[in-house]
Amino acid sequence: MNKFSREAGEVVLLRAITKYSSQQGTLFFTSLRLVWVQSGYSEPSLHLHISEIKNQFISTPKSAKALLRLSVRDSIKNALQEFVFEFTHPTNARSDLNSFRDKIAATANLTAPTLPVSASNGSNTTSPTNGTSPINGTSPTMTGLKVNPDGTITNDPLSSQPAQVEEKAETKYLSKLKQPSLSEQQIKQRVILLQSNKELRELYEQMVNKDRVISESDFWESRKSMLKNDSTRSEKQHTGMPSNLLADVRPSSETPNAVHYRFTPTVIHQIFIQHPSVEKAYKANVPLKISEQNFWKKYVQSKYFYRDRSSANAPPVDDDLFSKYETDEQNKIRILKRKLIDINPLVDLSSTDGFDTDVHSGYGVLLDQSQDPNKLEKALPLLRKFNRHSALVLGSKDLLTNNSINIEKDQKNLKKTKKDENSTSTPTTTTTTTNTTNTTNTTTTTTTNNTTIKDPNLYNGDDEENISVEQMEKILENHKKLVNQHIIIDDLQEENSQTLTLLKISDQKRYFEGHSTNNILSDKEKSQLIDILDFDYKNWQPNLPQVFYQTHSSSSILQEPNISVHSEIFEPYNKAAINSKEEYNLPESSFKRDLFQSFHHCNELLRHFWATTFTLGRGAPPTSQQIDKNNKISSAIALQYDKIEEKKKMLISQNKVNQSSLFTPILESLHKAIEKKESQTNQYTFKNNNNNFHTIS
């Protein structure tokens, strides 16, 4: 077992019998790497350096198999690869697993991952490792903070020491948490937010770690918006449609009796995009008519039957769950065989250049014989699949318009009846479905009639005789209107001259003769008037002192003895006002820090107090946890009130009245909370006394 090519100075520390990729072998833990040697071989089939191991997961103690899953960083591809080993010793499999877990954690300086993952076979799940070593070093961006085993974040006094092992930032904040829903990214956001916000960090240390008045979850519950708006949150750009087609889902594992498939949300989304009939069937049947797991079983079975339709053992087409939702694909072929009655009479049917936008499929244009639907019936589904995917990649707005126009109106009524059904169906999550090998011969056959979807304006040749007279008259009337709109040209029509009302004036002299001759100036008078205007304009001088306001001298008034006496009286008040302005400036000092810290602490306590407070007779009665939390916060509010009251008295004794007044609003808010708590206590005591009185009587 120990015979394999070892490097210089390499020493084997642990070894165990394991399976990797369904092959039996031996796993070695050396001083330099992790080596797996397949049975019957002398050379290592797999070797992993300890420094490249980033995460490890183990199966739960209740699991039937002892599994070890390692996440290894590939230095070439710069991506994480996963390796799963199954310990197969008859008696010591679990102990071997624990030994490897502890050794890897101690050597690679790993922390316990936060999210459990599934094993490769899909039947056993793995959970985070329990015994891991703490972090020896800290990231430069996260100096002074560490994640405790209970999920809280505290200052680390040893963080200033040099790091023994240099690790990436994303691997430092994994810890063994009591909150399984807390992900690594959420921990990183919280730590970085506390590191960047000094006031929030002080509040967190005081309320959560030191006084333990508020729990970790309650503290972050009211700060979800800060985490969402935090700069650490990755701004993920929406990924477009990939250009490659999704291949058929491959089985994750196979056994003699069953084949296991794994449908991830990404795979399901791709299936819905590439196969609209599957999405329609899902919305119409899941979860009211059929379970999600059975739905994907039928989907896998339908793929088998679709592949084997030409064989003798294939079930009828109507047996497929998705057959009735594929009528829109079949209508593409049927529409070419329809005889159209309600057609545009202005369409040039002789146009065969292919560039006339008014000519559409079905208007009598001769088709290429190579595109005959009868000859391409087997190839058309594949061609439509490629064309539809190309349109999706390019973001075409008129995607498959011709395919959906015939079923749009018919599906409108169906959507109304199944609106409630579709609203209750939720997006699927990662699902594992099983398709047994015996289901091929035991599939139930159900006959469904494919209804022909008709457009009101399209009629088959058989339906031409069933058209009523009213429908034909309506069609002809529409044709007449359409023709009139195109044959009548407004520019060629005679203009209708409008008759205007004539202006009748009885005395035209009043409007057209002007002034009398006596008021008309002569030429000499006109020239004199122009000369006077020109002389005044050239000789004009501005007189600005007369325009401006002339102020009177007030020096004599200010020097009166009454004013001097008045200033002497108000001189102390003026000095006090000047001092108060300087006092309110609040430069950086211990008082300002103390004031802001007291304000934030009281604000946090009051927010949680009023969130957990209750009034007898109003709303649902509080739970025991809410009552305990309210009592704990009330005690903290009373202590905070006494501290601030002492600070205020001390400032008053130092003649800092204005500074002491800044604490008054805080004390008033705390006093209201204390009064509310006392009233609750009195009401509760009074109610209990009444109950005891009635019981005694």
From Swiss-Prot:
The gene is gtf2h1. It comes from the Eukaryota. One of its GO terms (biological process) is nucleotide-excision repair. Residues 115-136, 423-452 have a biased composition (Low complexity). Belongs to the TFB1 family. Keywords: DNA damage, DNA repair, Nucleus, Repeat, Transcription, Transcription regulation. One of its GO terms (cellular component) is transcription factor TFIIH holo complex. Residues 115-141, 228-250, 412-462 are annotated as: Disordered. It is found in: Nucleus. This is General transcription factor IIH subunit 1. Residues 412-422 have a biased composition (Basic and acidic residues). Component of the general transcription and DNA repair factor IIH (TFIIH) core complex, which is involved in general and transcription-coupled nucleotide excision repair (NER) of damaged DNA and, when complexed to CAK, in RNA transcription by RNA polymerase II. In NER, TFIIH acts by opening DNA around the lesion to allow the excision of the damaged oligonucleotide and its replacement by a new DNA fragment. In transcription, TFIIH has an essential role in transcription initiation. InterPro entries: BSD_dom, BSD_dom_sf, PH-like_dom_sf, Tfb1/GTF2H1, TFIIH_BTF_p62_N. It comes from Dictyostelium discoideum (Social amoeba). Component of the 7-subunit TFIIH core complex composed of XPB/repB, XPD/repD, gtf2h1, gtf2h2, gtf2h3, gtf2h4 and gtf2h5, which is active in NER. The core complex associates with the 3-subunit CDK-activating kinase (CAK) module composed of cycH/cyclin H, cdk7 and mnat1 to form the 10-subunit holoenzyme (holo-TFIIH) active in transcription.
